[in-house]
Structures are given as structure tokens and as C-alpha cells.
From Swiss-Prot:
Its EC number is 2.7.7.4. The gene is sat. GO terms for molecular function: ATP binding; sulfate adenylyltransferase (ATP) activity. Disulfide bonds: none annotated. Coiled coil: none annotated. Pathway: Sulfur metabolism; hydrogen sulfide biosynthesis; sulfite from sulfate: step 1/3. GO terms for biological process: hydrogen sulfide biosynthetic process; sulfate assimilation. It comes from Synechococcus elongatus (strain ATCC 33912 / PCC 7942 / FACHB-805). This is Sulfate adenylyltransferase. Belongs to the sulfate adenylyltransferase family. NCBIfam families: PRK04149.1, sopT. SUPFAM superfamilies: Nucleotidylyl transferase, PUA domain-like.
């Protein structure tokens, strides 16, 4: 099902909607006990939701072999449309064997609840090492994204989906804004240009600097932190959300920012994921997307500006969303302000470089991030959360 929506065209031209109506849901529920079952892990469940709400438009289901191979090899769907990350439902041979192409498959969450259905059009094998090498640029299992690929089943199930059940987010129900709603909110505020910002870290001073630089040139900011599956050492989503709320309350104009959660899972695919994140924000209605240093990177697998360079391999009209590329920002001790090499007269010795990794290292040591790293209210919240977790662990 597609729908006419306000704002820029979604990727592929139509905002996909695969949420079952009440009548459709009842029809599927009546068949529940007779359908073969596949249990979804956290990432597959978030992918199901993102497909259903249109966040992954133009996808209406999990990728078939032709699309999958085209994306892995060429960063395009089989029809030529740019798409950089495969969206697949991988299962074991034991799960796949009894499933019949052309039939319906019941999709359950981890609690065994019937949350969706898959119209199974294809079952196919895939090369895990080839996917890892092409998508993640490494075959090392130490890479968290590669580890997921290696751990999942060897058979992909493909076909359109329907979402039957979706709970409000247990922690952030008020920030659960789907693409059709975000687009309407942008229109209601009169925003013609909107910049999206992807983050899985608390906003430190370098983030704040580049966000405000971007906000100088557009009508509004869509702050869209990822709350799906991340690495175990990433700062928990509830802590990060409190930090975002603090930043918006004290340091941003309230009428020019919308905060919403991104329910998709982090893949740590670096440059390819930067393209993926931009296309998602396009579907949410953003016209621009911030791409900073080492976007969606992990460890030393990607170059500092590889993600920015990858955007240059596509024609702007193909992507349909403009990347706003920023250099690594730092705190300049000479001017006592945030800057980049484009705006600072300082020497390297006068620059304090900031990163989410450094903030996490300080927190693990029980140290308060300095004001050059984080706003004091944010630093206080981070250290409070860290101490609270330590107290719980000690019980």
C-alpha cells in the first residue's frame, strides 16, 4: 500500500505502508495456528517495523536474491535505485526447509507473539564472506557487523511483509514518530528544508557545533537518534535520550528542532551505512543529512572521511537528499570556542579533539567529561547514570 504524503518524494517515489488494517489483522490471526513460524531477533524485528512504516521505502519486504546481490555488489537495487545495505531475513536450514515458496509465514517476536507475516516468494543461499567483504570492507569477525552476518543462518527468506502488531516504545512512546507523521510535522511548521542528524552517542560539543552550523542554512533540524540494537559498550538509549532532552532544553531553539527515535538497528557499516542513513532520513522527509567524521564507523576499519567520499559516487538526483559534509570539529584553546580547520587560526597543539569514544572512556573511569567535551548538564547526567549502573552492578 502506498500513500500521498507531504514534503519531498520518498526514495523510489512512494512511501510504503505495510501495516495491516484491523480486518486484515483478524484474517491473519484466524490462520495463526496453521502457519509455519519464524522467530525474529532484535534486528530482524526492527527491520520488519522499518519496512512497514516506510522507513525503508521502496522496500515492501525482505530482499530477494536479485536485489540482494545487486545491493551487495553495486549498492543498487536490481532496478538501479541506490541502496547500500542488504535488508534480509536469514534463518537456519532447519527453519527454512519446511517453508514453501508461495505460502505465508508467521513472524513472531522473541516472546512468541505473532507480530507479522511474510509472503514467502523465495528462499536462497548467500555467501557470508562476500557480503562481509563488500558491505563492511572486512571479513574479520571482530567487526560487530560482520559478527552478526557470520552468526546468522545461511538461508535468506524473501518476500513482502505485513506488520500486525507493534507496541509503543517502552521508554520513549512520545518520540515514536513514523515517516508519515514526521513529514506532516515538518509541513505544519512550514519547514521546506530539514536537516537530519543520525547519532548513537550523547551530543558532545563537536556534534553541537556541526548541527548548529547546518541549522543556520535550513528551516529545521530532525534529531533522530538510533535506539535499535547497538554494541554492548555503547551508552544505553535511555541515558542518551535524557542527554538529548537536556541539550534541546538548554542549547537549541525549541521551535526549530524535532526529536524522534530511529527504531532501526545499527550495522556499523561505515560509508555504506552513511548512504543508508541518508535514505532513511529522506523517507522521513529530510532534504539534507549531516555526514561527519567516520560516520557509522567502528574501530579503525574506515577512513575518517570515507563516508563523505562515497556520496560522490552517486549523482545528487539519484539520492534525492543533500549530504552536508563537515570536517572534524575541535575545541580551540586560543579562541576558546568550537571550530574546524576551516575557521580556526590555531596550531595543532591548541586543539582539543572530541569524540564519543573519548567520552565513553572517561565515563568508564568515573571521570566527569570536561566542559570542552560536553555541556555541564549533559556531563552531569552521564556521570549520574554511570554511577547508578555501578551501584546496581554492585548489589
Amino acid at each position: 500500500m502506498t500513500q500521498v504524503v507531504p514534503g519531498i518524494a520518498p526514495h523510489g517515489g512512494q512511501l510504503i505502508q505495510r501495516i495491516a488494517t484491523a480486518a486484515e489483522r483478524q484474517e491473519f490471526l484466524a490462520q495463526a495456528d496453521h502457519l509455519p513460524r519464524v522467530q525474529l531477533d532484535e534486528r530482524a524485528l526492527s527491520d520488519l517495523v522499518m519496512i512497514a512504516i516506510g522507513g525503508f521505502s521502496p522496500l515492501n519486504g525482505f530482499m530477494g536474491q536479485t536485489d540482494y546481490e545487486s545491493v551487495v555488489d553495486d549498492m543498487r537495487l536490481a532496478n538501479g535505485l541506490p541502496w547500500s545495505v542488504p535488508i534480509t531475513l536469514s534463518v537456519t536450514e532447519e527453519v527454512a526447509e519446511p517453508l514453501k515458496e508461495g505460502g505465508w509465514v508467521r513472524l513472531d517476536d522473541a516472546q512468541g507473539r505473532f507480530v507479522g507475516v511474510l509472503e514467502l516468494t523465495q528462499k536462497y543461499r548467500y555467501n557470508k564472506v562476500h557480503e562481509a567483504t563488500n558491505v563492511y570492507r572486512t571479513d574479520e569477525e571482530q567487526h560487530p557487523g560482520v559478527a552478526v552476518v557470520y552468526a546468522q543462518g545461511p538461508i535468506n527468506l524473501a518476500g513482502p511483509i505485513w506488520l500486525l502488531q507493534r507496541d509503543a516504545h517502552p521508554l520513549f512512546p512520545s518520540y515514536q514518530i513514523d515517516p508519515i507523521a514526521s513529514r506532516q510535522q515538518f509541513a505544519d511548521r512550514g519547514w521546506k528544508t530539514v536537516v537530519g542528524f543520525q547519532t548513537r552517542n550523547p551530543i558532545h560539543r563537536a556534534h553541537e557545533y556541526i548541527i548548529k552550523c547546518a541549522l543556520e542554512t535550513v528551516d529545521g533540524l530532525f534529531l533522530h537518534p538510533l535506539v535499535g540494537a547497538t554494541k554492548s559498550d555503547d551508552i544505553p538509549a535511555d541515558v542518551r535520550m535524557r542527554c538529548y532532552e537536556i541539550m534541546l532544553e538548554h542549547y537549541f531553539p525549541q521551535d526549530r528542532v524535532i526529536l524522534a527515535i530511529n527504531p532501526s538497528a545499527m550495522r556499523y557499516a561505515g560509508p555504506r551505512e552513511a548512504i543508508f542513513h541518508a535514505l532513511i532520513r529522506k523517507n522521513y522527509g529530510c532534504t539534507h543529512f549531516i555526514v561527519g567524521r567516520d560516520h557509522a564507523g567502528v574501530g579503525n576499519y574506515y577512513g575518517t572521511y570515507d563516508a563523505q567520499h562515497l556520496f560522490d559516487e552517486f549523482k545528487p538526483e539519484e539520492l534525492g537528499i543533500l549530504p552536508m559534509k563537515f570536517e572534524h570539529a575541535f575545541y580551540c584553546t586560543r579562541t576558546q570556542a568550537m571550530a574546524s580547520t576551516k575557521t580556526s587560526p590555531s596550531s595543532p597543539e591548541e586543539r582539543i579533539h572530541l569524540s564519543g569514544t573519548k567520552v565513553r572512556e572517561l565515563l568508564r573511569k568515573g571521570e566527569l567529561p570536561p566542559p570542552e567535551f560536553s555541556r555541564p548538564e549533559v556531563a552531569a547526567e552521564l556521570i549520574r547514570a554511570m554511577r547508578s549502573d555501578s551501584e546496581v552492578a554492585a548489589v
